[in-house]
Amino acid sequence: MATSSSLPRLRSRTVARDAGAPAAYALGALLLAGEAAVHVQQFVAEFYGVRWIGPLFVANAVAVVVTLAGLARARTRPAAALAGIVISAVALASLIISYGQGLFGWQEAGFRTPVALAMITEAGAVILLATALALRSE
């Protein structure tokens, strides 16, 4: 009795792909929320009085909240995912620049826990939201 092993394998790949995009969207949203939390905490603890940087931390958190609202609706999810990628990539690039020449007069020194958390949440959000968009278009 011969059986074809390609049918179950094909079915499992399809199921994995169909489940992959929603999971990537959800995890990307979770990382975006973490990014906003880090920015709010750092604004309150350290950057409330720093010209330009403090307001940019608040702007990041507000943009993330709007993006999370967009990710909650299926119709706006792809655009919101793209916005989340841009927000996180810009935040990560800004952090990197602040370690070099500085950003708007602020130069980051040392490697603190909030910096590590920001890097993890921002890079993770970019990767997962891009993955969600890629899986969606297949």
Regions found by a protein language model. Name each.
Residues 2-138:
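Membrane-interface extramembranous regions
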